From Swiss-Prot:
GO BP term (any one): transmembrane transport
Inducers of expression: Expression is induced under iron limitation.
Glycosylation site positions: 62
Assigned keywords, A-Z: Glycoprotein, Ion transport, Iron, Iron transport, Membrane, Transmembrane, Transmembrane helix, Transport
Membrane topology: Multi-pass membrane protein
Family: Belongs to the major facilitator superfamily.
Location in the cell: Membrane
Top-rank taxon, per record: Eukaryota
Protein name: MFS siderochrome iron transporter C
A GO molecular-function descriptor: siderophore-iron transmembrane transporter activity
Region listing for Disordered, in residue ranges: 1-25, 592-611
Length: 611
Protein backbone atom coordinates (compact mmCIF):
# COMPACT_ATOMS: atom_id res chain seq x y z
CA UNK A 1 0.00 0.00 0.00
CA UNK A 2 1.57 3.29 -0.98
CA UNK A 3 2.12 6.04 1.58
CA UNK A 4 1.29 8.80 -0.89
CA UNK A 5 -1.71 8.85 -3.20
CA UNK A 6 -2.93 12.22 -4.41
CA UNK A 7 -6.23 11.05 -5.86
CA UNK A 8 -7.97 10.10 -2.64
CA UNK A 9 -7.23 13.35 -0.87
CA UNK A 10 -4.25 14.51 1.06
CA UNK A 11 -5.49 13.43 4.45
CA UNK A 12 -7.41 10.24 3.92
CA UNK A 13 -6.21 8.49 0.81
CA UNK A 14 -2.61 7.77 1.63
CA UNK A 15 -3.01 4.01 1.88
CA UNK A 16 -5.56 3.21 -0.80
CA UNK A 17 -4.45 1.28 -3.87
CA UNK A 18 -6.13 2.79 -6.94
CA UNK A 19 -5.66 2.79 -10.66
CA UNK A 20 -3.01 5.24 -11.91
CA UNK A 21 -3.99 8.17 -14.12
CA UNK A 22 -1.79 10.75 -15.73
CA UNK A 23 -1.30 14.16 -14.12
CA UNK A 24 -2.44 15.95 -17.26
CA UNK A 25 -5.74 14.04 -17.37
CA UNK A 26 -6.33 14.79 -13.69
CA UNK A 27 -5.74 18.50 -14.17
CA UNK A 28 -8.04 18.62 -17.22
CA UNK A 29 -10.77 16.91 -15.25
CA UNK A 30 -10.24 19.26 -12.32
CA UNK A 31 -10.54 22.26 -14.63
CA UNK A 32 -13.81 20.85 -16.03
CA UNK A 33 -15.22 20.40 -12.54
CA UNK A 34 -14.26 23.96 -11.58
CA UNK A 35 -15.77 25.36 -14.77
CA UNK A 36 -19.06 23.52 -14.22
CA UNK A 37 -19.22 24.32 -10.50
CA UNK A 38 -18.82 20.73 -9.29
CA UNK A 39 -16.63 21.90 -6.39
CA UNK A 40 -18.59 25.01 -5.60
CA UNK A 41 -20.57 23.44 -2.78
CA UNK A 42 -17.46 22.30 -0.99
CA UNK A 43 -15.58 25.56 -1.32
CA UNK A 44 -18.63 27.58 -0.40
CA UNK A 45 -19.26 25.53 2.71
CA UNK A 46 -15.70 26.10 3.81
CA UNK A 47 -16.01 29.86 3.35
CA UNK A 48 -19.31 29.99 5.17
CA UNK A 49 -17.74 28.27 8.16
CA UNK A 50 -15.32 31.23 8.37
CA UNK A 51 -12.25 29.06 7.98
CA UNK A 52 -9.10 31.15 8.17
CA UNK A 53 -7.44 32.32 4.97
CA UNK A 54 -4.38 30.09 5.27
CA UNK A 55 -6.54 27.01 5.77
CA UNK A 56 -8.67 27.87 2.73
CA UNK A 57 -5.50 28.19 0.67
CA UNK A 58 -4.11 24.79 1.64
CA UNK A 59 -7.50 23.15 1.13
CA UNK A 60 -7.60 24.58 -2.38
CA UNK A 61 -3.98 23.55 -3.01
CA UNK A 62 -4.83 20.04 -1.82
CA UNK A 63 -7.28 19.79 -4.72
CA UNK A 64 -4.54 20.60 -7.24
CA UNK A 65 -1.89 18.08 -6.17
CA UNK A 66 -0.84 15.58 -8.80
CA UNK A 67 1.23 12.49 -8.06
CA UNK A 68 4.32 14.17 -9.50
CA UNK A 69 3.90 17.45 -7.63
CA UNK A 70 3.18 15.71 -4.33
CA UNK A 71 6.31 13.57 -4.64
CA UNK A 72 8.35 16.69 -5.47
CA UNK A 73 6.96 18.38 -2.37
CA UNK A 74 7.99 15.47 -0.16
CA UNK A 75 11.43 15.29 -1.76
CA UNK A 76 11.76 19.00 -1.08
CA UNK A 77 10.79 18.49 2.56
CA UNK A 78 13.51 15.84 2.81
CA UNK A 79 16.10 18.09 1.13
CA UNK A 80 15.41 20.97 3.50
CA UNK A 81 15.41 18.59 6.46
CA UNK A 82 18.79 17.24 5.39
CA UNK A 83 20.27 20.75 5.36
CA UNK A 84 18.78 21.75 8.70
CA UNK A 85 19.88 18.43 10.20
CA UNK A 86 23.44 18.83 8.93
CA UNK A 87 23.45 22.41 10.20
CA UNK A 88 22.29 21.28 13.64
CA UNK A 89 24.93 18.57 13.90
CA UNK A 90 27.63 20.99 12.78
CA UNK A 91 26.88 24.00 14.96
CA UNK A 92 26.25 21.85 18.05
CA UNK A 93 30.00 21.38 18.32
CA UNK A 94 30.63 25.12 17.87
CA UNK A 95 28.60 26.40 20.82
CA UNK A 96 31.29 25.69 23.41
CA UNK A 97 33.87 27.57 21.33
CA UNK A 98 31.59 30.52 20.61
CA UNK A 99 30.77 31.07 24.29
CA UNK A 100 34.39 30.43 25.25
CA UNK A 101 35.46 33.17 22.82
CA UNK A 102 33.56 35.54 25.11
CA UNK A 103 35.02 33.79 28.23
CA UNK A 104 31.52 32.56 29.08
CA UNK A 105 31.63 28.79 28.50
CA UNK A 106 29.30 28.22 31.46
CA UNK A 107 26.57 30.19 29.66
CA UNK A 108 26.01 27.29 27.24
CA UNK A 109 23.08 26.30 29.43
CA UNK A 110 21.67 29.85 29.36
CA UNK A 111 21.85 29.81 25.57
CA UNK A 112 20.04 26.45 25.57
CA UNK A 113 17.43 27.82 27.97
CA UNK A 114 16.78 30.70 25.57
CA UNK A 115 16.48 28.20 22.70
CA UNK A 116 14.14 25.91 24.62
CA UNK A 117 11.99 28.80 25.85
CA UNK A 118 11.50 29.98 22.27
CA UNK A 119 10.96 26.40 21.10
CA UNK A 120 8.32 25.91 23.78
CA UNK A 121 6.28 29.02 23.08
CA UNK A 122 6.65 29.41 19.30
CA UNK A 123 4.98 26.19 18.11
CA UNK A 124 1.32 27.10 18.75
CA UNK A 125 1.54 30.65 17.33
CA UNK A 126 3.57 29.49 14.31
CA UNK A 127 0.87 26.95 13.48
CA UNK A 128 -1.69 29.75 13.76
CA UNK A 129 0.35 31.99 11.46
CA UNK A 130 0.21 29.21 8.86
CA UNK A 131 -3.57 29.02 9.27
CA UNK A 132 -4.12 32.78 9.15
CA UNK A 133 -1.76 33.72 6.30
CA UNK A 134 -0.89 30.47 4.48
CA UNK A 135 1.67 27.64 4.44
CA UNK A 136 3.89 29.21 1.79
CA UNK A 137 3.92 32.56 3.56
CA UNK A 138 4.68 30.95 6.93
CA UNK A 139 7.57 28.95 5.46
CA UNK A 140 9.05 32.16 4.00
CA UNK A 141 8.80 33.97 7.34
CA UNK A 142 10.48 31.06 9.14
CA UNK A 143 13.35 30.95 6.65
CA UNK A 144 13.87 34.71 6.94
CA UNK A 145 13.97 34.60 10.76
CA UNK A 146 16.30 31.58 10.60
CA UNK A 147 18.76 33.42 8.35
CA UNK A 148 18.67 36.57 10.49
CA UNK A 149 19.57 34.49 13.53
CA UNK A 150 22.61 32.97 11.84
CA UNK A 151 23.84 36.29 10.53
CA UNK A 152 23.58 37.75 14.02
CA UNK A 153 25.41 34.78 15.59
CA UNK A 154 28.22 34.97 13.05
CA UNK A 155 28.65 38.71 13.64
CA UNK A 156 28.23 38.67 17.44
CA UNK A 157 30.94 40.36 19.50
CA UNK A 158 29.66 39.48 22.97
CA UNK A 159 27.68 36.73 24.64
CA UNK A 160 24.59 38.95 24.97
CA UNK A 161 24.36 39.38 21.20
CA UNK A 162 25.07 35.68 20.69
CA UNK A 163 22.31 34.70 23.14
CA UNK A 164 19.80 37.14 21.62
CA UNK A 165 20.50 35.65 18.18
CA UNK A 166 19.22 32.33 19.56
CA UNK A 167 15.75 33.88 19.70
CA UNK A 168 15.68 34.39 15.92
CA UNK A 169 17.41 31.09 15.21
CA UNK A 170 15.13 29.07 17.49
CA UNK A 171 11.98 30.79 16.22
CA UNK A 172 12.97 30.07 12.62
CA UNK A 173 14.04 26.48 13.17
CA UNK A 174 11.00 25.67 15.30
CA UNK A 175 8.78 27.30 12.70
CA UNK A 176 10.22 25.03 10.03
CA UNK A 177 9.78 22.01 12.28
CA UNK A 178 6.11 22.62 13.01
CA UNK A 179 5.34 23.62 9.40
CA UNK A 180 6.91 20.42 8.08
CA UNK A 181 4.74 18.42 10.47
CA UNK A 182 1.64 20.40 9.46
CA UNK A 183 2.36 19.67 5.80
CA UNK A 184 2.82 15.98 6.57
CA UNK A 185 -0.45 15.98 8.52
CA UNK A 186 -2.12 17.41 5.41
CA UNK A 187 -1.14 14.31 3.45
CA UNK A 188 -1.23 11.36 5.85
CA UNK A 189 -3.69 9.37 7.89
CA UNK A 190 -3.28 8.20 11.49
CA UNK A 191 -1.67 4.82 10.76
CA UNK A 192 0.92 6.21 8.32
CA UNK A 193 1.57 9.45 10.19
CA UNK A 194 4.07 7.83 12.57
CA UNK A 195 6.23 6.87 9.58
CA UNK A 196 5.86 10.03 7.51
CA UNK A 197 6.39 12.27 10.54
CA UNK A 198 9.89 10.78 10.72
CA UNK A 199 10.81 12.07 7.26
CA UNK A 200 12.53 15.19 8.68
CA UNK A 201 14.46 12.94 11.08
CA UNK A 202 15.89 10.48 8.54
CA UNK A 203 18.83 12.76 7.58
CA UNK A 204 20.19 12.27 11.11
CA UNK A 205 21.26 8.79 10.05
CA UNK A 206 23.92 10.43 7.87
CA UNK A 207 24.45 13.92 9.26
CA UNK A 208 25.12 12.69 12.78
CA UNK A 209 28.45 11.31 11.57
CA UNK A 210 29.59 13.99 9.14
CA UNK A 211 28.43 17.03 11.14
CA UNK A 212 31.16 16.86 13.82
CA UNK A 213 33.79 16.30 11.11
CA UNK A 214 32.64 19.45 9.31
CA UNK A 215 32.71 21.36 12.61
CA UNK A 216 36.26 20.14 13.27
CA UNK A 217 37.35 21.24 9.77
CA UNK A 218 35.70 24.64 10.20
CA UNK A 219 37.48 25.23 13.50
CA UNK A 220 40.83 24.18 12.03
CA UNK A 221 40.67 26.01 8.70
CA UNK A 222 38.31 28.94 9.33
CA UNK A 223 36.53 30.00 12.53
CA UNK A 224 33.38 29.26 14.47
CA UNK A 225 31.87 32.42 12.92
CA UNK A 226 32.04 30.96 9.42
CA UNK A 227 30.56 27.74 10.82
CA UNK A 228 27.40 29.74 11.58
CA UNK A 229 27.42 32.19 8.70
CA UNK A 230 27.61 29.64 5.87
CA UNK A 231 24.13 28.33 6.71
CA UNK A 232 22.58 31.70 5.93
CA UNK A 233 23.43 30.86 2.29
CA UNK A 234 22.87 27.09 2.22
CA UNK A 235 19.46 26.96 3.92
CA UNK A 236 17.59 29.38 1.62
CA UNK A 237 18.97 27.48 -1.38
CA UNK A 238 17.62 24.20 0.00
CA UNK A 239 14.20 25.81 0.55
CA UNK A 240 13.74 26.85 -3.10
CA UNK A 241 12.27 23.52 -4.37
CA UNK A 242 9.63 23.44 -1.64
CA UNK A 243 8.87 27.13 -2.12
CA UNK A 244 8.36 26.66 -5.85
CA UNK A 245 6.23 23.57 -5.29
CA UNK A 246 3.88 25.38 -2.92
CA UNK A 247 3.85 28.60 -4.95
CA UNK A 248 3.12 26.91 -8.30
CA UNK A 249 0.29 24.82 -6.86
CA UNK A 250 -1.12 27.88 -5.14
CA UNK A 251 -1.08 29.72 -8.47
CA UNK A 252 -2.71 26.72 -10.12
CA UNK A 253 -5.47 26.81 -7.50
CA UNK A 254 -6.01 30.51 -8.21
CA UNK A 255 -6.11 29.85 -11.94
CA UNK A 256 -8.77 27.19 -11.37
CA UNK A 257 -10.68 29.68 -9.19
CA UNK A 258 -10.36 27.40 -6.15
CA UNK A 259 -8.96 30.29 -4.11
CA UNK A 260 -11.49 33.08 -4.04
CA UNK A 261 -10.24 36.68 -4.12
CA UNK A 262 -9.92 38.12 -0.64
CA UNK A 263 -12.73 40.43 0.34
CA UNK A 264 -11.82 43.88 1.55
CA UNK A 265 -11.43 43.88 5.36
CA UNK A 266 -14.31 45.56 7.14
CA UNK A 267 -13.89 48.13 9.87
CA UNK A 268 -10.57 49.69 8.97
CA UNK A 269 -7.08 49.11 10.33
CA UNK A 270 -8.16 48.85 13.96
CA UNK A 271 -10.65 46.08 13.19
CA UNK A 272 -8.03 44.15 11.22
CA UNK A 273 -5.54 44.43 14.09
CA UNK A 274 -8.22 43.35 16.55
CA UNK A 275 -9.09 40.26 14.50
CA UNK A 276 -5.41 39.38 14.12
CA UNK A 277 -4.92 39.78 17.88
CA UNK A 278 -7.70 37.29 18.58
CA UNK A 279 -6.74 34.94 15.74
CA UNK A 280 -3.18 34.60 17.07
CA UNK A 281 -4.19 34.93 20.75
CA UNK A 282 -1.43 37.46 21.33
CA UNK A 283 -2.41 37.85 24.99
CA UNK A 284 -1.93 34.15 25.63
CA UNK A 285 1.35 34.17 23.73
CA UNK A 286 2.67 37.09 25.80
CA UNK A 287 1.68 35.43 29.09
CA UNK A 288 3.16 32.06 28.09
CA UNK A 289 6.41 33.61 26.83
CA UNK A 290 6.80 35.80 29.91
CA UNK A 291 6.05 32.96 32.33
CA UNK A 292 8.51 30.52 30.79
CA UNK A 293 11.26 33.08 30.23
CA UNK A 294 11.05 34.88 33.58
CA UNK A 295 11.00 31.64 35.58
CA UNK A 296 13.65 29.60 33.77
CA UNK A 297 16.30 32.08 32.65
CA UNK A 298 16.99 33.40 36.21
CA UNK A 299 17.91 29.86 37.28
CA UNK A 300 21.11 30.06 35.24
CA UNK A 301 21.71 33.80 35.67
CA UNK A 302 21.57 33.72 39.48
CA UNK A 303 24.97 32.06 39.79
CA UNK A 304 26.60 34.85 37.78
CA UNK A 305 24.71 37.65 39.53
CA UNK A 306 26.60 39.70 42.11
CA UNK A 307 24.10 38.97 44.89
CA UNK A 308 22.96 35.58 43.58
CA UNK A 309 19.41 34.67 44.55
CA UNK A 310 19.20 37.82 46.68
CA UNK A 311 19.47 40.01 43.60
CA UNK A 312 16.40 42.24 43.24
CA UNK A 313 16.25 41.66 39.48
CA UNK A 314 16.35 37.86 39.86
CA UNK A 315 13.57 37.88 42.48
CA UNK A 316 11.48 40.32 40.45
CA UNK A 317 11.73 38.18 37.29
CA UNK A 318 10.65 35.03 39.11
CA UNK A 319 7.72 36.76 40.85
CA UNK A 320 6.44 38.28 37.60
CA UNK A 321 6.95 34.94 35.84
CA UNK A 322 4.89 33.09 38.46
CA UNK A 323 2.13 35.71 38.18
CA UNK A 324 2.00 35.24 34.39
CA UNK A 325 1.95 31.45 34.82
CA UNK A 326 -1.01 31.65 37.23
CA UNK A 327 -2.86 34.09 34.96
CA UNK A 328 -2.35 31.99 31.80
CA UNK A 329 -5.03 29.29 32.38
CA UNK A 330 -7.61 31.95 33.37
CA UNK A 331 -6.86 33.89 30.18
CA UNK A 332 -7.01 30.81 27.97
CA UNK A 333 -10.30 29.71 29.56
CA UNK A 334 -12.02 33.04 28.88
CA UNK A 335 -14.19 33.07 25.77
CA UNK A 336 -14.08 36.86 25.73
CA UNK A 337 -10.31 37.30 26.14
CA UNK A 338 -9.27 34.26 24.10
CA UNK A 339 -12.02 33.21 21.66
CA UNK A 340 -9.37 31.25 19.72
CA UNK A 341 -7.05 30.12 22.54
CA UNK A 342 -3.38 29.38 22.02
CA UNK A 343 -3.57 26.32 24.29
CA UNK A 344 -6.53 23.94 24.30
CA UNK A 345 -6.47 23.30 28.04
CA UNK A 346 -9.58 21.13 27.92
CA UNK A 347 -7.51 18.49 26.10
CA UNK A 348 -5.68 17.86 29.37
CA UNK A 349 -8.93 16.43 30.77
CA UNK A 350 -8.25 13.45 28.52
CA UNK A 351 -6.24 10.91 30.54
CA UNK A 352 -4.04 9.86 27.64
CA UNK A 353 -3.30 13.41 26.54
CA UNK A 354 -2.41 14.47 30.09
CA UNK A 355 -0.23 11.41 30.71
CA UNK A 356 1.48 11.74 27.32
CA UNK A 357 2.29 15.44 27.72
CA UNK A 358 3.56 14.88 31.27
CA UNK A 359 5.68 11.94 30.13
CA UNK A 360 7.20 14.07 27.38
CA UNK A 361 8.04 16.77 29.96
CA UNK A 362 9.96 14.41 32.28
CA UNK A 363 11.58 12.48 29.42
CA UNK A 364 13.10 15.58 27.86
CA UNK A 365 14.06 17.06 31.23
CA UNK A 366 16.13 13.93 31.93
CA UNK A 367 17.73 14.30 28.48
CA UNK A 368 18.89 17.82 29.36
CA UNK A 369 20.36 16.60 32.64
CA UNK A 370 22.41 13.89 30.95
CA UNK A 371 23.09 14.12 27.21
CA UNK A 372 22.75 17.91 26.99
CA UNK A 373 24.19 20.46 27.53
CA UNK A 374 27.44 19.53 29.34
CA UNK A 375 28.07 15.93 28.30
CA UNK A 376 30.01 17.17 25.26
CA UNK A 377 32.31 19.30 27.46
CA UNK A 378 32.67 16.39 29.91
CA UNK A 379 33.84 14.09 27.12
CA UNK A 380 36.45 16.57 25.91
CA UNK A 381 37.83 17.52 29.31
CA UNK A 382 37.54 14.34 31.39
CA UNK A 383 37.80 11.66 28.71
CA UNK A 384 40.17 13.62 26.46
CA UNK A 385 38.13 13.28 23.25
CA UNK A 386 38.77 15.60 20.31
CA UNK A 387 36.02 17.75 18.77
CA UNK A 388 34.93 15.20 16.16
CA UNK A 389 34.93 12.20 18.52
CA UNK A 390 33.04 14.01 21.27
CA UNK A 391 30.53 15.23 18.69
CA UNK A 392 29.96 11.72 17.33
CA UNK A 393 29.43 10.26 20.80
CA UNK A 394 26.90 12.92 21.80
CA UNK A 395 25.09 12.53 18.48
CA UNK A 396 24.84 8.76 18.80
CA UNK A 397 21.56 9.44 20.60
CA UNK A 398 20.10 11.11 17.50
CA UNK A 399 21.30 8.27 15.25
CA UNK A 400 20.01 5.37 17.34
CA UNK A 401 16.76 7.11 18.28
CA UNK A 402 16.00 7.74 14.59
CA UNK A 403 16.54 4.06 13.73
CA UNK A 404 14.43 2.96 16.70
CA UNK A 405 11.67 5.42 15.79
CA UNK A 406 11.67 4.18 12.18
CA UNK A 407 11.36 0.57 13.34
CA UNK A 408 8.58 1.33 15.81
CA UNK A 409 6.63 3.36 13.22
CA UNK A 410 6.56 0.31 10.93
CA UNK A 411 5.52 -1.95 13.82
CA UNK A 412 2.73 0.46 14.78
CA UNK A 413 1.43 0.41 11.21
CA UNK A 414 1.01 -3.36 11.28
CA UNK A 415 0.19 -4.00 14.96
CA UNK A 416 -2.15 -0.97 15.10
CA UNK A 417 -1.18 -0.52 18.75
CA UNK A 418 1.22 1.92 20.37
CA UNK A 419 1.28 1.68 24.19
CA UNK A 420 3.48 -1.41 24.43
CA UNK A 421 6.22 0.47 22.59
CA UNK A 422 5.88 3.43 24.98
CA UNK A 423 6.33 1.14 27.99
CA UNK A 424 9.31 -0.64 26.40
CA UNK A 425 10.89 2.68 25.47
CA UNK A 426 10.58 3.99 29.03
CA UNK A 427 12.24 0.87 30.44
CA UNK A 428 15.12 0.99 27.95
CA UNK A 429 15.56 4.74 28.52
CA UNK A 430 15.84 4.17 32.28
CA UNK A 431 18.42 1.41 31.75
CA UNK A 432 20.47 3.76 29.57
CA UNK A 433 20.45 6.48 32.25
CA UNK A 434 21.60 3.98 34.89
CA UNK A 435 24.44 2.88 32.59
CA UNK A 436 25.50 6.53 32.15
CA UNK A 437 25.82 6.82 35.93
CA UNK A 438 27.87 3.62 36.11
CA UNK A 439 30.33 4.69 33.37
CA UNK A 440 30.62 8.39 34.19
CA UNK A 441 34.04 8.01 35.91
CA UNK A 442 37.40 8.87 34.36
CA UNK A 443 38.98 5.96 32.52
CA UNK A 444 35.79 4.46 31.09
CA UNK A 445 36.47 2.95 27.69
CA UNK A 446 35.02 4.58 24.56
CA UNK A 447 32.98 1.41 23.96
CA UNK A 448 31.36 1.66 27.39
CA UNK A 449 30.40 5.30 26.89
CA UNK A 450 29.14 4.62 23.37
CA UNK A 451 26.93 1.76 24.58
CA UNK A 452 25.22 4.07 27.07
CA UNK A 453 24.28 6.49 24.28
CA UNK A 454 23.03 3.67 22.07
CA UNK A 455 20.74 2.38 24.83
CA UNK A 456 19.46 5.85 25.76
CA UNK A 457 18.86 6.58 22.06
CA UNK A 458 16.91 3.37 21.51
CA UNK A 459 14.74 4.14 24.52
CA UNK A 460 14.08 7.68 23.31
CA UNK A 461 13.21 6.50 19.81
CA UNK A 462 10.85 3.80 21.08
CA UNK A 463 8.81 6.12 23.26
CA UNK A 464 8.84 9.51 21.51
CA UNK A 465 6.84 8.76 18.34
CA UNK A 466 4.26 6.45 20.00
CA UNK A 467 3.59 8.96 22.79
CA UNK A 468 2.92 11.71 20.24
CA UNK A 469 0.65 9.35 18.32
CA UNK A 470 -1.25 8.44 21.49
CA UNK A 471 -1.81 12.11 22.33
CA UNK A 472 -3.06 12.76 18.79
CA UNK A 473 -5.35 9.73 18.92
CA UNK A 474 -6.93 10.95 22.17
CA UNK A 475 -8.06 14.19 20.51
CA UNK A 476 -10.93 14.76 18.12
CA UNK A 477 -10.15 15.40 14.46
CA UNK A 478 -10.53 19.15 14.89
CA UNK A 479 -8.11 19.13 17.85
CA UNK A 480 -5.27 17.08 16.39
CA UNK A 481 -3.17 20.15 15.60
CA UNK A 482 -3.73 21.58 19.09
CA UNK A 483 -2.89 18.23 20.69
CA UNK A 484 0.33 17.99 18.68
CA UNK A 485 1.31 21.52 19.67
CA UNK A 486 0.67 20.80 23.34
CA UNK A 487 2.74 17.61 23.20
CA UNK A 488 5.69 19.35 21.53
CA UNK A 489 5.37 22.34 23.86
CA UNK A 490 5.38 20.06 26.93
CA UNK A 491 8.51 18.34 25.67
CA UNK A 492 10.29 21.63 25.01
CA UNK A 493 9.23 22.90 28.44
CA UNK A 494 10.85 19.86 30.01
CA UNK A 495 14.01 20.56 28.03
CA UNK A 496 13.98 24.19 29.12
CA UNK A 497 13.60 23.26 32.79
CA UNK A 498 16.34 20.64 32.47
CA UNK A 499 18.72 23.06 30.76
CA UNK A 500 18.02 25.76 33.35
CA UNK A 501 18.56 23.46 36.33
CA UNK A 502 21.66 21.85 34.82
CA UNK A 503 23.08 25.31 34.22
CA UNK A 504 22.38 26.27 37.82
CA UNK A 505 24.10 23.12 39.10
CA UNK A 506 27.07 23.61 36.76
CA UNK A 507 27.63 27.29 37.54
CA UNK A 508 27.27 26.70 41.29
CA UNK A 509 29.55 23.66 41.58
CA UNK A 510 32.37 23.91 39.03
CA UNK A 511 33.96 27.19 40.28
CA UNK A 512 33.69 26.09 43.91
CA UNK A 513 35.22 22.69 43.25
CA UNK A 514 38.01 24.17 41.11
CA UNK A 515 39.02 26.45 43.98
CA UNK A 516 38.93 23.43 46.27
CA UNK A 517 40.99 21.03 44.15
CA UNK A 518 43.39 23.20 42.11
CA UNK A 519 47.00 23.42 43.31
CA UNK A 520 47.59 26.49 45.44
CA UNK A 521 49.57 28.28 42.76
CA UNK A 522 46.77 27.79 40.20
CA UNK A 523 43.72 28.71 42.29
CA UNK A 524 43.74 32.17 40.72
CA UNK A 525 43.04 30.55 37.33
CA UNK A 526 39.77 28.98 38.50
CA UNK A 527 37.53 31.61 36.89
CA UNK A 528 39.42 31.44 33.57
CA UNK A 529 39.23 27.63 33.53
CA UNK A 530 35.52 27.76 34.35
CA UNK A 531 34.80 30.36 31.68
CA UNK A 532 36.76 28.86 28.76
CA UNK A 533 36.82 25.21 27.79
CA UNK A 534 39.94 25.89 25.72
CA UNK A 535 41.71 26.97 28.92
CA UNK A 536 40.75 23.71 30.62
CA UNK A 537 41.95 21.70 27.61
CA UNK A 538 45.28 23.54 27.54
CA UNK A 539 46.53 21.56 30.56
CA UNK A 540 47.86 18.10 29.59
CA UNK A 541 46.08 14.98 30.80
CA UNK A 542 47.66 13.67 34.00
CA UNK A 543 49.04 17.02 35.12
CA UNK A 544 48.06 18.17 38.66
CA UNK A 545 45.91 20.98 37.26
CA UNK A 546 44.10 18.71 34.78
CA UNK A 547 43.50 16.11 37.50
CA UNK A 548 41.84 18.79 39.62
CA UNK A 549 39.77 20.01 36.66
CA UNK A 550 38.66 16.49 35.84
CA UNK A 551 37.64 15.83 39.44
CA UNK A 552 35.52 18.99 39.49
CA UNK A 553 33.87 18.01 36.19
CA UNK A 554 33.22 14.41 37.30
CA UNK A 555 31.64 15.30 40.63
CA UNK A 556 29.42 17.95 39.04
CA UNK A 557 28.36 15.67 36.18
CA UNK A 558 27.46 13.00 38.75
CA UNK A 559 25.01 15.44 40.35
CA UNK A 560 23.42 16.08 36.96
CA UNK A 561 22.99 12.34 36.39
CA UNK A 562 21.37 11.97 39.82
CA UNK A 563 18.84 14.61 38.77
CA UNK A 564 18.28 12.67 35.52
CA UNK A 565 17.58 9.47 37.48
CA UNK A 566 15.04 11.35 39.61
CA UNK A 567 13.37 12.79 36.51
CA UNK A 568 12.81 9.37 34.91
CA UNK A 569 11.00 7.88 37.93
CA UNK A 570 7.50 8.86 36.66
CA UNK A 571 8.01 7.53 33.11
CA UNK A 572 6.74 3.96 33.50
CA UNK A 573 3.66 4.87 35.62
CA UNK A 574 2.73 7.57 33.10
CA UNK A 575 3.10 5.13 30.19
CA UNK A 576 0.76 2.70 31.95
CA UNK A 577 -1.78 5.51 32.41
CA UNK A 578 -2.12 6.00 28.65
CA UNK A 579 -5.04 4.20 27.02
CA UNK A 580 -4.08 1.46 24.56
CA UNK A 581 -6.04 2.62 21.51
CA UNK A 582 -6.56 0.39 18.50
CA UNK A 583 -5.46 2.90 15.89
CA UNK A 584 -7.18 1.42 12.85
CA UNK A 585 -10.53 1.90 14.62
CA UNK A 586 -9.81 5.60 15.13
CA UNK A 587 -9.22 6.74 11.54
CA UNK A 588 -10.20 10.35 11.01
CA UNK A 589 -13.18 11.09 8.82
CA UNK A 590 -13.16 13.93 6.29
CA UNK A 591 -14.86 17.18 7.30
CA UNK A 592 -16.31 17.64 3.81
CA UNK A 593 -18.06 14.90 1.87
CA UNK A 594 -16.19 13.74 -1.22
CA UNK A 595 -17.45 14.75 -4.64
CA UNK A 596 -18.73 11.61 -6.39
CA UNK A 597 -17.20 10.83 -9.75
CA UNK A 598 -19.30 9.89 -12.74
CA UNK A 599 -18.74 6.44 -14.11
CA UNK A 600 -15.57 6.36 -16.15
CA UNK A 601 -14.36 9.73 -14.91
CA UNK A 602 -11.11 10.38 -13.17
CA UNK A 603 -11.51 11.09 -9.48
CA UNK A 604 -9.78 14.29 -8.47
CA UNK A 605 -8.32 15.10 -5.06
CA UNK A 606 -11.66 14.86 -3.35
CA UNK A 607 -11.34 15.58 0.31
CA UNK A 608 -10.78 18.97 1.86
CA UNK A 609 -9.15 18.91 5.28
CA UNK A 610 -8.84 21.64 7.86
CA UNK A 611 -5.59 21.67 9.80
Amino acid sequence: MPFLDHRTGPSYGTIDQMEQHSDDEGERFLQEQCDTGRFSSDITSISEDSVQEGVRKIEAINLTWTARSLVIAYVSIFLMSFCTSLEGQTVMSLGAYATSAFSKHSLISTVLVVQNVVNAVIKPPMAKVADVFGRFEAFCVSILIYVLGYIQMAASTNVQTYASAQIFYSAGSTGLQILQQVFIADSSNLLNRAFLALLPEFPFLVTVWIGPTIADAVLKHASWRWGYGMWSIILPASFLPLALSLLLNQRKARRLNLIKPKSRPRGGVFAVLRRTWYDLDMGGLILLSAAVTLILVPLTLAANSKNGWKSDSIVAMIVVGLFCLIALPFWESSKRLAPKPLLSLHLLKQRTALAGCTLAFWYFMAFYFSVQPYFYSYLQVVQGYDVATAGRVTQTFAFTSTIAAFAVSILIKYTRRYRAFVIAGCVVYIIGMVLMMVTRHEGSTPAQILVTQVVVGIGGGLLNVPVQLGVQASASHQEVAAATAMFLTSMEMGGAVGAALSGAVWTHNIPRKLRLYLPEENKGDADAIFGKITKALSYPLGSPVRVAINQAYQETFKKLLILALIAIIPLVPLSLAMEDYKLDKMSEEPLVDPVPAEEGEIEPNRHVKRT
